[in-house]
Amino acid sequence: MARLTVEDCIDNIDNRFLLVLAAAKRARQLAMGATPTVPWDKDKPTVVALREIAEGHIDVGVMDTASAREHAKESQVSEEEVREES
């Protein structure tokens, strides 16, 4: 496993807080089946997301409004699921 630091990524996303948000969003996308832009060598999605940012493949654009709509769609629960839990 490659060891990554904030310094490896800060050249591409210069705000540490935005870096964390972008990495978390990209890690969720990877966990949901998004195609990685770097080789995936048995690493966790968070490590792959940070490697993508460090190599300049991913930036804060990953947090656009379209992805917010995707997240809202993914989080919707059907009436059938509600009945099953009752």
Swiss-Prot record:
Keywords: DNA-directed RNA polymerase, Nucleotidyltransferase, Transcription, Transferase. InterPro entries: DNA-dir_RNA_pol_omega, Pol_omega/Rpo6/RPB6, RPB6/omega-like_sf. Residues 77-86 have a biased composition (Acidic residues). GO terms for molecular function: DNA binding; DNA-directed RNA polymerase activity. It catalyses: RNA(n) + a ribonucleoside 5'-triphosphate = RNA(n+1) + diphosphate. It is an enzyme of class 2 (transferase). GO terms for biological process: DNA-templated transcription. Its EC number is 2.7.7.6. Residues 67-76 have a biased composition (Basic and acidic residues). Residues 67-86 are annotated as: Disordered. It comes from the Bacteria. SUPFAM superfamilies: RPB6/omega subunit-like (SSF63562). GO terms for cellular component: DNA-directed RNA polymerase complex. Promotes RNA polymerase assembly. Latches the N- and C-terminal regions of the beta' subunit thereby facilitating its interaction with the beta and alpha subunits. Belongs to the RNA polymerase subunit omega family. The RNAP catalytic core consists of 2 alpha, 1 beta, 1 beta' and 1 omega subunit. When a sigma factor is associated with the core the holoenzyme is formed, which can initiate transcription. This is DNA-directed RNA polymerase subunit omega. It comes from Nitrosococcus oceani (strain ATCC 19707 / BCRC 17464 / JCM 30415 / NCIMB 11848 / C-107). The gene is rpoZ.
